Structures are given as C-alpha cells and as structure tokens.
Amino acid sequence: MRVVLDTNALIRAHGRTSTQARILLEELLRADHELITSNELLAEVTKVLRYPRFQALYGLSEADLLDYTQLLQSVSQVVILDSSYRAPLRDPNDLIVLQTAERGEADILCTNDGNFYDPTILSYCTARGIEVCDESTLLERLMQGG
C-alpha cells in the first residue's frame, strides 16, 4: 500500500513521541508499505517543528530535526512536485499534501484535516484512485493486517 501521511501526522510522528501518529509511521514501515513524501512536505514538517510552541513541547535540536528529516527521506519515496499544480482545495497549504499523494500515485492519503473530507475533494481523490482516511482508521487497518 502506498501512503501519504499529511504534515500534521508527520509532525506528531517524530522520534520523541509515542503518539498515534508515531505508532502509525512505525507500523507502515514495519509492514513494508510505501511511505510517499516530497521535499516540500518534509520542509514544511521541519519548519513547523522549529516553531517556538513545538520547540517548547518537544525540545528538538537541529540535529534531531535533521535526523528525523533524513530518516523520512531514507524510508520514503520522495516525489517531485510541480509549482503550477492546482486542485479544488480551500486551503492552498493543503496543495502540497494532495499533490504529493497524486504525484506519488498513493493508495491512501492519511489525514485528520477536515478540508480533505469535503465532498468535492473526496470525489477529486476518488477519481484519482486515492482513498482519504484518518489516522485511527488506517492504524486499525494496518493492525488487522491490511
């Protein structure tokens, strides 16, 4: 199964946590599924983890951030995005996530972001063979051997 975890999931999945997102990432990799990322997605994750509130919460050093980014790059298929990409999303920041899924021919785009559950976006994704599901649903599926 080819999976894109959205920015928020990847932020919560770094090595200093035991969150559902971290368990999901570990299970994806353990079960030999393919994680799909893009340089833009990884840059956004790194940028957000540098925000003061996340630094206060997680206390990640620059070395920790570099290690995490390198880990994600090494275990994922990194796809190249097109800056002219357009899709019917309300939040332009979500374009990176959606384009990563589309370019990477993902089977699943895993997100808890309500914008992706808009009927227009669900139809857009379905037409491209991409299922949108939340972290809990995907983790449950993986735990059942899916």
Model region roles, listed by residue range:
Residues 27-84:
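PIN-domain endoribonuclease scaffold, especially VapC-family toxins
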Residues 104-108, 114-146:
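Acidic, PIN/NYN-like endoribonuclease modules and their adjacent C-terminal/linker elements
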Residues 9-10, 41, 96, 115-116, ...:
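Alpha-helix capping/helix-boundary segments
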Residues 1-37:
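Short, well-structured N-terminal submotif of metal-dependent ribonuclease cores
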Residues 73-109, 120:
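Active-site neighborhoods of divalent-metal-dependent phosphate/nucleic-acid chemistry enzymes
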Residues 6-7, 37-38, 112-113, 134:
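A secondary-structure boundary/capping signal
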Residues 27, 100, 124:
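Hydrophobic/aromatic ligand-binding patch that stacks against planar heteroaromatic rings
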